[in-house]
Amino acid sequence: MAGSEEVNLIESKTVVPLNTWVLISNFKLAYNLLRRPDGTFNRHLAEFLDRKVPANANPVNGVFSFDVIIDRQTNLLSRVYRPADAGTSPSITDLQNPVDGEIVPVIVFFHGGSFAHSSANSAIYDTLCRRLVGLCGAVVVSVNYRRAPENRYPCAYDDGWAVLKWVNSSSWLRSKKDSKVRIFLAGDSSGGNIVHNVAVRAVESRIDVLGNILLNPMFGGTERTESEKRLDGKYFVTVRDRDWYWRAFLPEGEDREHPACSPFGPRSKSLEGLSFPKSLVVVAGLDLIQDWQLKYAEGLKKAGQEVKLLYLEQATIGFYLLPNNNHFHTVMDEIAAFVNAECQ
């Protein structure tokens, strides 16, 4: 069982930079207010507490953005981020001009939030996507997928799949060198989970995805692992929290052996023999579900898939949101190298 909140806060303060600690502690407080014991969720309060930013066609630090409706029936929206030439200010007619580059990676990004929180226009994810543009010289398409518990499995996967198909069919995203859309999938927490499941659909439909980037991906199972027992409540998250989110997302009556939660469990499809994208799996050593993340990386390896595991021993959840720690710079360098290796 987790210790007292006072002890947990003291422990987390010793390893987390102050502004990151404040950021994630505020998230934890808000999340506790939003979840209800009966499995419902205070969406109105969640939207009020989540600081959002609009798309901005005026370049900021060399990046401009705009929102696109992908599916009017489901109100599926994505925010597109593009590099801007120095000193230019694109007009509305320029937003979907062909990409200007021999090879331009396109990163389809899925935000975190345990399937229930945040959105494509959340300030923290707007900032992260802008960083990815500058880091990789990429176009980033951030998916505003439907959230649980109002929209359970497989809604988030369906939305991710719809955006991937839209990206793949968008001629203005093709690199000049070979007229191909060079697609990467990336996401954190629940977004990392969505990356895996959308990639499986891509393989089955023969849409070429060059790589998957999973930051602290949200996976699980019915057993309690060593890391879940050891880190329960110590660094912002409890096992009880995670259980609530799985109950909110999975089909009613399902347990955590469902393939959406346990991708290499007894009920999941085998990836052996499939042309699955190569993967970069980033694991924080102070994330209580790290054992499930490590099991995921091992599952890819056993299935004969290419995977690079980046294990950061003293990192906590959310370390990649603020550039105030060495782990942030390490993972950003790894992401850039991972993407650039396929864009020579």
UniProtKB/Swiss-Prot annotation:
Enzyme Commission number(s): 3.-.-.-
Main localization (coarse): nucleus
Enzyme type, top EC level: hydrolase
Subcellular localization, as worded in the UniProt entry: Nucleus
Ranges in coiled-coil conformation: none
Modified-residue entries (N-acetylalanine), positions: 2
Pfam families per the UniProt record, alphabetical: Abhydrolase_3
Residues at which gibberellin A3 binds: 114, 125, 189, 236, 318
Tissue expression remark: Widely expressed.
Reported phenotype of the disruption mutant: No visible phenotype under normal growth condition.
Binding-site residues for gibberellin A4, renumbered to this chain: 113-114, 125, 189, 318
Catalytic center residues: 189, 287
Keywords: Acetylation, Gibberellin signaling pathway, Hydrolase, Nucleus, Receptor
Motif placement: Involved in the stabilization of the negatively charged intermediate by the formation of the oxyanion hole: 111-113
Cellular-component GO terms for this entry: nucleus
Family to which the UniProt record says this protein belongs: Belongs to the 'GDXG' lipolytic enzyme family.
PANTHER family for this protein: ARYLACETAMIDE DEACETYLASE (PTHR23024), GIBBERELLIN RECEPTOR GID1C (PTHR23024:SF492)
Subunit structure: Interacts with the DELLA proteins GAI, RGA, RGL1, RGL2 and RGL3 in a GA-dependent manner.
Protein's job: Functions as a soluble gibberellin (GA) receptor. GA is an essential hormone that regulates growth and development in plants. Binds with high affinity the biologically active gibberellin GA4, but has no affinity for the biologically inactive GAs. In response to GA, interacts with specific DELLA proteins, known as repressors of GA-induced growth, and targets them for degradation via proteasome. Seems to be required for GA signaling that controls root growth, seed germination and stem elongation. Partially redundant with GID1A and GID1B.
Name assigned to this protein: Gibberellin receptor GID1C
Organism lineage: Eukaryota, Viridiplantae, Streptophyta, Embryophyta, Tracheophyta
Primary gene name: GID1C
